[in-house]
């Protein structure tokens, strides 16, 4: 979910997919097995120097004002470098993902807007739903996978995410590694592909883009050409090895989004960097074809996973 490779003038894409010897019985998301040593030293990412930072009182987060009334809420002190997005309309705001739940994201949101806030997750992995329990108006995809994950994640499954290796800095005082967990949350409305959210003068459309997980979505602002893309694409290893992943389904989702590229101006990924070029989806599609056709060999890494690097 993160990487040491930076975007330069040429796209660098690394995929991590399940090898034939990967055990489908593996429990949890074995994150730390692929953390690069010294990842903290690669920070800050250069893109942030060119963005307007907004001061907030909760220092776990960094907030950046993007174009078109969008705020990127970034967690740089944890190795996932997760990014949630607050999107403002005239009458409502939408929070796309709620992060790891290490810092209280609701405190940040309340400083950025007085509008009522609806929450929608790009998918229900733990690093995207950590702050859901802080909100009452939650939309979620109507899938069995989603319904299973509303119960949250136990300390056993997520405690490595706040281990020394996973952090670049100190935890908030209220976080105890022995008791840290992802809380359960209540969904107000279950939704499906094509659902539209009216924020007042701004319409967002939910696009079902499964593959990384069965409930993965992208969020489209067609009028402005913006696409919040979750974990489908970002600057880093794109995880396609956990049991809930389906490579063929993921490819179909990427192909769907590639058809939209002519109408897009900006991608907002969920990790590492808040801005990516829509044309990056073409490179991702090509990489997936090469993996599926066996025209490139992967390198076996921890857990029997295969790593593919594309430039």
Residue ranges and their predicted role:
Residues 1-8:
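N-terminal secretory signal peptides that target proteins for export/translocation
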Residues 9-16:
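Sec-dependent signal peptide recognition
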Residues 14, 24-55, 252-311:
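Accessory terminal helices/loops
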Residues 48-60, 65-66, 93, 100-101, 141-207, 213, ...:
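Metallo-beta-lactamase
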Residues 57-111, 219-234:
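Conserved beta-strand hairpin/beta-sheet module of binuclear metal-dependent hydrolase folds
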Residues 67, 74-76, 123, 142, ...:
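Residues at the C-termini of beta-strands that transition into short coil/loop
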Residues 102-196, 235, 280-297:
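Active-site HxH/HxHxD metal-binding segment of metal-dependent hydrolases
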